[in-house]
């Protein structure tokens, strides 16, 4: 029992904001027409007693004037203020510096703050379970230490974006997919966008009116993509012999979706 109030199974969520940003930006760019995703953070944090969010404001780029810089960081300042206003949420800011065009921005202090806070809450027995959202392999020693201390550690990581050593270190793990993020979106935003429509069929519903326009071939699967009247359908034959069908009106978004859902959660090298 963690609290004197008698609360059982206290769960804290620790979020690497840079990792979460990268995940959301990827889906925005590849699947939702570059629209700014509207996240209901209370949905994201459902089931957790406290949420700790760590990030930093973007560094000013070389040659960037102050007005442009202030306009560029406004959305992140707005996000930080929004998160601070939510019950259970706590925001901690590190610093960043712009190194050069090739290496881009370097984030400082955030990783250390996450490590210190997770270990502190664990050693004080403030929580029974810690969940860390990250894809950074540098956190493996922290997870190892917490597990060895008896803390139950779960890892949330972007699908295909985390090293298997990091994933294997946690007691449990969850790959963050487009379906995960869809569950976090606000109801209003869901009305503005759509995912491919899924259907299972025992027969191939493709006739001569459809034109094959592409195929996606990987080591473990092959998907054929057809078009008719600006509507696209991707056909995946299962090992049972039936067909998984995915329909969408945007070819690039459909192809990204197919590769995303059929890729392994984590890449392992033999």
Identify the role of each PLM range.
Residues 1-270:
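Terminal and domain-boundary accessory regions
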